[in-house]
Amino acid sequence: MKPVIETHALCKSYHGRPVVDHLNLTVPEGCVYGFLGPNGAGKSTTMKMLLGLVHPTGGSVELLGHTLNEANRIALLRQTGSLIESPSGYLHLTARENLSIVADLKDVDRKDISRVLEIVHLTKDADRKVGQYSLGMKQRLGIAIALLGSPKLLILDEPTNGLDPAGIQEMRSLIASMPQTTGATVLISSHLLGEIEQMVDQVGILSHGKLLFEGSLQQLQKHSRGDILLRVLDAPKAAAVLQQQGVKAAAPADQPDTLQLPPLPDEALAALVCTLAESGVGVVGLTAQTKSLEDIFLSLTQTSGEVA
């Protein structure tokens, strides 16, 4: 099965400065893909190139199995819904009236309006003027507009931006259910992994226009192991044995019976414990610290892809 989105060495430069740098992105069908990176990483520019709103300096984009070009752009975009930057809409009109205008422009049957209103939980507020909506309601209306016509792909640029905690939770639930409720694959951008990790299956991490990581959340977790805390009966003796084995151990000032070791493979760690026991060092406990996904994300983006 072909991916819904593929980019091949995609580049965009402004005045000679690369904003997107040889990006190879792969978004599988039927997933919610989190496109992550700090502000200014190139996420919005990439999304605009996926929609044909910005012309690449180099490389190519494939949407729904077809290379995006001027000849097929409109046909492909009819199968794509998007919410880029702030949600658009006429504030003096109701949500239903806004949706009617877009449905006519898209040549979509107006009967589809009730369906998308129900998906985003705006049915009860459909006849209120959009100017009376909260930011979260406006964001949901933007997604309803994107869903008109049952697109196969949804591209959402930071839809949780500016929302309060309740609004973020509501948006998480809505987007996480999209592949099941609408059949659409979702590409969602954010600069905060913590905001979207509960709704995505796959992640791509962008920094300075380069893709640092792409894979599942589980793969991202495995991408970095935390330090190991070793509790022993004789810390100085244990440190000396470890040094003989080429392992540098630190002694936390507030834990005199504990040594802090760098991340080690399971086999190496098991061998070290055996060596310590054979040397007469009593090993009391062993704790492998786990970095949070947010810590891994920050490490990647702050160190050009090398996890600190």
For each of these PLM feature ranges, what is it?
Residues 1-2, 306-308:
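Short, low-complexity, intrinsically disordered N-terminal peptides in bacterial proteins
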Residues 227-295, 299-300, 308:
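Short, charged/small-residue-rich alpha-helical element at the C-terminal edge
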Residues 172-262:
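ABC transporter nucleotide-binding domain
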Residues 105, 303-304:
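Phosphate/oxyanion-binding loops and surfaces in catalytic or ligand/nucleic-acid-binding neighborhoods
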Residues 2-7, 12-188, 193-207, 213:
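ABC transporter nucleotide-binding domains
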